[in-house]
Amino acid sequence: MGFRTSVSRGMLIGASVLCFASTPAAAECVIGSEPLFDPFAPYKGGSAIVHKDSGFVFPAETAGFRRLCEMTTDFSGDNFQIRYERTIGDQPIAVDIAVVHLEDLTARDHYRIIKPTVMSHYASASIESEGDYFVSGRDDLSAYQGIFDGQKDNVPWHVSLTAIDYGYWDARLIASYPHELDVPAQEALMELVAAFQWQSPVDEEEGGGD
């Protein structure tokens, strides 16, 4: 699916998305927030977090990954992010999943806005591949993915950025891990994507959002 791009509106949206994208690497995890300041508090049930406006469910553990962070930069509920992590041996695989409300931007537009910020966190970052991405079993979704190589603390690192256009909602996944974990990490990420792939955030109109 696609949207007509409005240059002026796209620039404003791009600025806000870029600002939000810069928080994962710089911000500490928000864990155990006081209820007054926790935007997810009213929607938590059992071990899962349910985002009220989109209906997206984030379990505490899934596909071997453990949920670590509950973060938001927009208390209206339009932008939020959650981090998952899995350890193979003593090496971590970190995945930041963000769901944002964008207008007039395609998955490729979303990806191109975020890419420079993601690459800036790694030394000698280079693009390994980028292009349209197929979400298995979901022909209805438009997605775009880039895979990058870089270094973190002098250790070769692998990073992928995937933007998905759900319509009213857009999602992105930023996965990072040491390059030596490439094969097992890719397998683990496929399991994580499979665990989420059948979820479809509801549109604002469908969900009757505030």
Report the location of each language-model feature:
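Bacterial N-terminal signal peptides that target proteins for export
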Residues: 2-14
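A short acidic-to-branched-hydrophobic micro-motif
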Residues: 80-113
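N-terminal "mature-domain start" segment
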Residues: 28-83
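Surface-exposed amphipathic alpha-helical segments
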Residues: 172-210
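Short, surface-exposed coil-to-beta transition loops
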Residues: 77-81, 92-94, 153-161
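N-terminal signal peptide c-region/cleavage motif recognized by signal peptidases
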Residues: 20-24
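Long, charged/polar, surface-exposed segments that mediate recognition or autoinhibition
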Residues: 102-134
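Signature of long, low-cysteine stretches enriched in small and polar/charged residues
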Residues: 123-162
